Structure formats: structure tokens, C-alpha cells
């Protein structure tokens, strides 16, 4: 039986962990995840999905603020683990820890070498990629730069957003890891170096990147909106107030970028640099998320054709 330390944080990681727990070829000696955080307006302390899954399985849990140089790292090195599996952990692993293991692999939610970094699923959508996927790779000190052990792709559809793609790729990552680990541990797979000429980076989304620029095409804005749904959520401004857009569809239309072209009972069409967007799910300032019909029947009922979204 191979003894593992698992490291991860979000739902994606929890799905991978649960997959490992179903396979009796592996024993999880410990789980490492990010500390509990205060979330939302009420600052409610929330455990990570990986911590919740580990508690349900009765596993030992470590939550260092920073793994490098921590007492937790020293404890982990004394457990006698054969290897480490990480999936969206959110911290760099110290070389000292990596060197103490027979192997260390990462489940990364992109088709490397494209989309190294912390937001690969977001950027696959924002940049209009036709496919997404998961890469199992060896861990090295440089971020997401290790040799690739295996890859698996899935198509991106127009119905996908960050939420749906996260769910799909979590299952892909779980299955690919279970399919890959036995042969890799046995030495039957020769990892492949990444082509450095094809590397792109997908760092965590910055707040300024959430703002919509109506001087882009309808397709570009469609990809930005779904590439931030359900988090961190794209926004614009309406009458000086922040206005979040969760869902929109590219449609035909022509006008000044940001201009309202038409208003119906269940339709709000806004011009872009090329074509237009039909807004479907929005959140006005100080209000909950709502469909466009509810918005137009409520706080949006005073809108008129010709008004503008934007600064």
C-alpha cells in the first residue's frame, strides 16, 4: 500500500481526495489544507471543502498559514509517507519537503503548458479556449513547471461557466489521477518535459480585471462574464452604481458600446464594439442576484433605450 500526504483546498481538491479514499491501494496519512477563513459580509468562519472531506473520513488534518519552515512541515516529514499528491492547494511546497519524498505529483486543471497558475479554469473561458483539461505532473519548485505524467481534455461548450467547468474537471482530475498513479509509481511512465515556448500564465484574477469594457466584442465580453461566474463575477456600472452580470448571451445588434438597444419584458440588449449582449442574470447594487425579467420588473423598470452602461 502506498502511503500518501494529500494537499488541497477547494471543492475540486475534495473530489480528488474522495477518489483516492475509494482506492485501497493508497493510505492517506495526513491532509494539508488552508486555514479556516472568515467569508461573506457576516465574516462567518468557514472550513475548506478539503478539511470537511478529511473530517468525514477521520483523517489527520494540518492547516499551516505557511507550510515552509513550519512545525507542521517537520511533522509531515516524520510520517513516513511515500509521496505527496496536491490539487489546488494554494501554497508553494518547500524543496526540503519535496526532496524527502519518493515522489510528489500535482493535479492541475489545465492542459499544460498552457494556463500555469492559480486560475486556469477562469482563463480557459476568458480566452475563448475550445477545450479544457487536467494535467498530472511532477512537482518542482517553479510553479506548475514540472514534467507532465498524463493529460486528459474535454470540450468547452457555450453553456459552460467557471462553476460547471470546475465540476467537470474535478471528475476528470479524480479519474485521471487514479488511472495514472499505479503505472507512474511502478516506473512504467516516462514524464514529458513541458514545451517552454508554449507556456502561458493564468494568475489569480485581479479586481480590475472583473470590470467589463464595452469596447470589446460581444464574444469577448460573453467569455469574460462566464469566465467569472459564479466567482469573482464581472461588473459594469449603471447610473454610477456597480452592476454585476452573471450571465449574458452574444446576439446581433449595433450601437455605441454600452448603449441599451432594446428593452422587453424579459430582454435587455446592450451594444458592444461588435454585436450586442442580451443580459440574462444580473445583480444591481444593494440587491440579490436575479434574472433579467425580475430586474426589469423592479429596479430596472425606469431604464430607457439609449441609456448607457459603463463609467
Curated annotation (Swiss-Prot):
Q: Its Gene Ontology biological processes?
A: conversion of methionyl-tRNA to N-formyl-methionyl-tRNA
Its name, as the record gives it, is Methionyl-tRNA formyltransferase
Q: Which organism is it from?
A: Streptococcus pneumoniae (strain ATCC BAA-255 / R6)
Q: What does this protein do?
A: Attaches a formyl group to the free amino group of methionyl-tRNA(fMet). The formyl group appears to play a dual role in the initiator identity of N-formylmethionyl-tRNA by promoting its recognition by IF2 and preventing the misappropriation of this tRNA by the elongation apparatus.
Q: Where does (6S)-5,6,7,8-tetrahydrofolate bind?
A: 110-113
**What are its E.C. numbers?**
2.1.2.9
Q: Does the keyword Methyltransferase apply?
A: no
Annotated PANTHER family: METHIONYL-TRNA FORMYLTRANSFERASE, METHIONYL-TRNA FORMYLTRANSFERASE, MITOCHONDRIAL
Amino acid at each position: 500500500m502506498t502511503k500518501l500526504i494529500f494537499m488541497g483546498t477547494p471543492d475540486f481538491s475534495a473530489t480528488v481526495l474522495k477518489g483516492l479514499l475509494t482506492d485501497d491501494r493508497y493510505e492517506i496519512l495526513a491532509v494539508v489544507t488552508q486555514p479556516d477563513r472568515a467569508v461573506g459580509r457576516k465574516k462567518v468562519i468557514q472550513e475548506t471543502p478539503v478539511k470537511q472531506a478529511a473530517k468525514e473520513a477521520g483523517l489527520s488534518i494540518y492547516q499551516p498559514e505557511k507550510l515552509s519552515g513550519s512545525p507542521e512541515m517537520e511533522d509531515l516529514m516524520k510520517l513516513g509517507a511515500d509521496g505527496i499528491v496536491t490539487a489546488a492547494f494554494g501554497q508553494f511546497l518547500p524543496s526540503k519537503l519535496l526532496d524527502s519524498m519518493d515522489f510528489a505529483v500535482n493535479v492541475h486543471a489545465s492542459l499544460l503548458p498552457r494556463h500555469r497558475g492559480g486560475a486556469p479554469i477562469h482563463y480557459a473561458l476568458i480566452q475563448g479556449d475550445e477545450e479544457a483539461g487536467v494535467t498530472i505532473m511532477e512537482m518542482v519548485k517553479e510553479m506548475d513547471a514540472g514534467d507532465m505524467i498524463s493529460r486528459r481534455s474535454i470540450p468547452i461548450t457555450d453553456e459552460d461557466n467557471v462553476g460547471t467547468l470546475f465540476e467537470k474537471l474535478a471528475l476528470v482530475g479524480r479519474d485521471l489521477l487514479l488511472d495514472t498513479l499505479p503505472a507512474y509509481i511502478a516506473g512504467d511512465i516516462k514524464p514529458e518535459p513541458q514545451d517552454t515556448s508554449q507556456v502561458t500564465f493564468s494568475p489569480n484574477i485581479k479586481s480590475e480585471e472583473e470590470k467589463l469594457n464595452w469596447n470589446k466584442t460581444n464574444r469577448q465580453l460573453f467569455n469574460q462574464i462566464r469566465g467569472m461566474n459564479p466567482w469573482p463575477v464581472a461588473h459594469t456600472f449603471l447610473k454610477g452604481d456597480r452592476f454585476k452580470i452573471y450571465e449574458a448571451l452574444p446576439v446581433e445588434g449595433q450601437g455605441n458600446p454600452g448603449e441599451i438597444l432594446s428593452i422587453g419584458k424579459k430582454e435587455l440588449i446592450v451594444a458592444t464594439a461588435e454585436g450586442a449582449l442580451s443580459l440574462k442574470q444580473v445583480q444591481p447594487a444593494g440587491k440579490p442576484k436575479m434574472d433579467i425579467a425580475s430586474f426589469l420588473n423592479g429596479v430596472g423598470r425606469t431604464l430607457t433605450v439609449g441609456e448607457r452602461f459603463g463609467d
